[in-house]
Every structure is written in structure tokens, then in C-alpha cells.
Amino acid sequence: LVSVRSGAAISMPGMMDTVLNVGITDQTELVLATESGDTAFARDTHRRFAQLYGNVVLKANVDGFDNGQSADHWREEIRKATGSELPNDATGQLLGAVGAVFESWNSRRAKRYRQHQGISDLLGTAVTVQAMVFGNLDARSGTGVLFSRNPSTGDAEPFGEYLRRAQGEDVVSGSFTPEPLSAMSDAAPAAYTELLAAARTLEHAEKEVQDIEFTVERGELFLLQTRSAKLAPQAEVRTAIAMAREGLIAIRTAICRIPPDRIRQLMAPRICADARAAAVQLAGGEGACPGVGIGIVVTDADEAERLSDQGVAVVLARRTTSPHDLHGMISSTAVVTEEGGSTSHAA
């Protein structure tokens, strides 16, 4: 089985589509169950593929598939939603997945992200076809994201999250709330030690904070991808200074890494201690970025964009976010979610 991912020259986290478990069919599910010795794992993998392929490639907008349902049931639900067939052959699945990843370059969210980040629409993307490893296999398996330094504060300590018995999209999509990375040290201690060493090596080689996606399969570590991390303004400044002091980069390089707009963001409003003490706290959570957002609460991304265009400050509140919410997130002064961790693409 393989995963099909984007490979743009400039990384756009969460903006382009990914399809996992490509190649699983009724027949290969039986083979996977035999080789793994776990029919529940094989069924879970097939269910994950059907739902993701149906939504990403066929635009089915289906949810709630259950491992207790048959593959025929999943195919029928997708057929009713789209009028299209879920392929039950590896070649058809692969061709469909590759086409969908290419097409996602021109999706609304990808175009909006490039506009916001000043990235040319002419660059295009490659497609990466990569062998699958299975974080959903057993209790010694899982998936996560590791930053070689804290992306919110710039602290020179690894920061990340881990989700047991899961696949990578479960973490970065924000659909599940993972555990702190330290949970991995209990579940797979050898892989945890190896991961921290790999993060140091990659950061030293790239001379930038690394955002690493990884999977653990039966205690064995696999690095899926690494890229230069997106950092909060405070973290960007602290990291540049720290790397210059450590001799990783030159002082001139450190200065050039901080564009003027990031300095302006550092001057954004903060809550003073007296106001914090006097405030009535309605809810609490884990901050993905420092600063203060003020506005009326809206729960729909389109509504957030519409009100923002009228000059109204809004805070977007969602159970969880998806890349389809990007236009609303960009238009909001702050985003609040009920689920998802601080290493998700939305954060």
C-alpha cells in the first residue's frame, strides 16, 4: 500500500490533498489481515481509505464510516453521494489519487493561502508516492509531529504531539486531540530516543527549525517528511538569535531571517496582568500562538470572511478546523477549536 502526497517547492501545510492506504481492495484486505495477524487492523485500514478517497478524490462528503460495516456498504454510500464508483483495484485508486493531488493545487484554500503568503500560482507541484507504514497497527504503533524547537515560544527544546494507534492525518487534520510527545517515551522508548536524535541531526543540517511528521510501527520509527517549520513571531526572533549564538548560522543570516512584518506582529496587544486577574474566564485551552484576538464569535468560515470584509472583527470558533476553513481563519483575529492539538496544520 502507498500514500499519495503533494510535493510543492514551497511547503503549504494542510493546503493540498493527501490520500493514504492506496492499493487496499477486498482482496488485499484479506492479505493484510493474514500478514499482520489482525483482522481489525486490516478492516480499519480499508475503512480509512474508503472514507478519505471518497471525500478527497470523489468529493463525497461522507462521514461516520464504521469498521463494522462492509466495504460494499461504503462503496454504496459513496455511489449514492457522488454517482461515482470507489475503485476496487490498485491502479484505478492510484490514478485517481494522483489526479486529485494535482488538482488540489488549484483549490480555493490553496489559492487563498498562496495569495496570503505571496507565493506564485505558476510554481505547480509534484506528487510523491510513498510506501505506507501503519501507526494504527497495534499498541506499540502511533503517529505524531515533532518540532526541533518550540514553534510558539522558540524554546530550544523539542516540542511535539503523539497519537497512539493512529495515522498521520489524524494528527495534522486537527480531528483528534493527541497526547504530549512524552507519551511516546512510554509507548515506544527506543523510537522516542531515535526521533530526538534525528531532529537534532536534521536541524543541524538544514540550519532551521524542523517540522517532522513521523510514524511508529510496532516500535520502529519511520520519518515521513521534514520541512522548515512555521514559527510564531516571538519564536522566529528567539530562534534566530539562539542559532546565531550557537554558531549554526551567521549573525547576518539571523538578522535577514526576520522580515519587518514579523517585528510588527511582536508589538501586537497582550493582556496585562491586572486585566487577566480581573477577567471572567469562560474557557481555557492550549495556545498555539501568543497574542490577543478580540471580536464577535462566529462559527462559520464564510460568515467570518463576510463580516471581516465589512470591517467587523471576528473570532472564528469551530469544533475542529479543516483546510476548507482557511479563508475564514485568515479573516479572523483569532481561532478557537474544541478539538485538535497545537501541531495540527491549522495551529
Give the positions of each predicted feature:
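Catalytic domains of riboflavin
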Residues: 273-296, 310
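Nucleotide/phosphate-binding sheet-loop regions of phosphoryl- and nucleotidyl-transfer enzymes
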Residues: 1-279, 306, 312-314, 320-327, ...
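Short, flexible loop segments at the rims of nucleotide/cofactor-binding pockets, characterized by
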Residues: 294, 335-336
